[in-house]
Amino acid sequence: MEKTCIDALPLTMNSSEKQETVCIFGTGDFGRSLGLKMLQCGYSVVFGSRNPQKTTLLPSGAEVLSYSEAAKKSGIIIIAIHREHYDFLTELTEVLNGKILVDISNNLKINQYPESNAEYLAHLVPGAHVVKAFNTISAWALQSGALDASRQVFVCGNDSKAKQRVMDIVRNLGLTPMDQGSLMAAKEIEKYPLQLFPMWRFPFYLSAVLCVFLFFYCVIRDVIYPYVYEKKDNTFRMAISIPNRIFPITALTLLALVYLPGVIAAILQLYRGTKYRRFPDWLDHWMLCRKQLGLVALGFAFLHVLYTLVIPIRYYVRWRLGNLTVTQAILKKENPFSTSSAWLSDSYVALGILGFFLFVLLGITSLPSVSNAVNWREFRFVQSKLGYLTLILCTAHTLVYGGKRFLSPSNLRWYLPAAYVLGLIIPCTVLVIKFVLIMPCVDNTLTRIRQGWERNSKH
């Protein structure tokens, strides 16, 4: 073998396989990048082009022929052209008969056509073995070698031998083939590169709605109300003070919403007396988004920490502290030290620090590189047991912050309670229901149901 692929980590290194010729139809960015990668890994590459004489920028060592001549050189042909230009393949039906056609194309939008591109290709050339692959790898990644985050290649096809040959090529290129089954899976594979954060939409939309609602709520209480009754201009609070109330409330609410669907699912299973009935679609989607909800919540918690750290350097805080000091000096008064206030203040800060530490720990363990290194019991312990402990600490942090002001009528403005009171509704609800669910009389029944027992079983 004259060349070896530096980036390749193949499972099997068969010399005869590495010397085989691969044909690539199309000389665009992806076709050239894939051809270069194959040349580096020892394959012979033949490009098929409609204008072989005018083709430029191809990797050295590759041969360029017409489509029909190039197809005769190899048993595997990679179709690196768009679906709109597949029609010419019908003219090569006899040449392509019995060959493996690898469809790598993607569409501009999801469900652009009634069938997948691979199925359409199989319909155009019924005598060929069509395999879908390489559509999740970009040309830039192939050229730069930046494949650490995208080494997985989804492969599907109706012919198992053809699919296996393509998967061998994928391995020899240093990538990881993922067998997705028959060609019917091609439609889902083609949707994958076109999706834009599908599991992040609900968390983003929900957090945006919460932030907007809390912003207007705080503006009404802290800006409009003082202006109406006291003629005070508190608009400067919209820069730091109000966001520093919105972010922790949103973080705590989203964290509670991570564990609320699990509580609802447990109640449904107890009510139904079985685990063999499917959850509603909205609950199923909600449970699938829990990781994203938690990470968005962690982001808001980080913002809360950053905004809190800048409080001492704010002009308003320095002015208020200096003005209070001068006033006390003029009046010759001093505030006596309050042990109870010191306890409340230190407890509030300590609970916040511990809660944020566990919050960060939850975020770290949700990373694929970390979650793959622990077993299921360890992962469940961190995400469930420590997760609820995090929720308890963060809720206690907010409760201690409120102190005695929860029941104070002077804290109501236009009969509206402080924003942090709203932020405690969902977390406290989740914790109360969870406390009921972990009681032995309830937990034992729930455990039996999740192990397959049915209340109304006929067997």
Curated annotation (Swiss-Prot):
One of its GO terms (biological process) is fat cell differentiation. Keywords: Cell membrane, Copper, Electron transport, Endosome, FAD, Flavoprotein, Glycoprotein, Golgi apparatus, Heme, Ion transport, Iron, Iron transport, Membrane, Metal-binding, NADP, Oxidoreductase, Transmembrane, Transmembrane helix, Transport. Signal peptide: none annotated. Heme b binds at H304, H397. NADP(+) binds at residues 27-30, 49-50, 67, 81-85, 106, 139, 171. Its main location: membrane. Its EC number is 1.16.1.-. Glycans are attached at N323. The keyword Transferase does not apply. The keyword Cytoplasm does not apply. Induction: By TNF and IL1B/interleukin-1 beta in adipose tissue. Up-regulated by androgens, including testosterone and dihydrotestosterone (DHT). GO terms for cellular component: early endosome membrane; endosome; endosome membrane; extracellular exosome; Golgi membrane; membrane; nucleoplasm; plasma membrane. It is found in: Cell membrane; Golgi apparatus membrane; Early endosome membrane. It comes from the Eukaryota. Fe(3+) binds at Y217, Y307. Its cofactor is FAD; heme b. GO terms for molecular function: cupric reductase (NADH) activity; electron transfer activity; FAD binding; ferric-chelate reductase (NADPH) activity; heme binding; metal ion binding. Homotrimer. Interacts with PTK2/FAK1; the interaction may regulate PTK2 phosphorylation. Integral membrane protein that functions as a NADPH-dependent ferric-chelate reductase, using NADPH from one side of the membrane to reduce a Fe(3+) chelate that is bound on the other side of the membrane. Mediates sequential transmembrane electron transfer from NADPH to FAD and onto heme, and finally to the Fe(3+) chelate. Can also reduce Cu(2+) to Cu(1+). Plays a role in systemic metabolic homeostasis, integrating inflammatory and metabolic responses. Associated with obesity and insulin-resistance. Involved in inflammatory arthritis, through the regulation of inflammatory cytokines. This is Metalloreductase STEAP4.
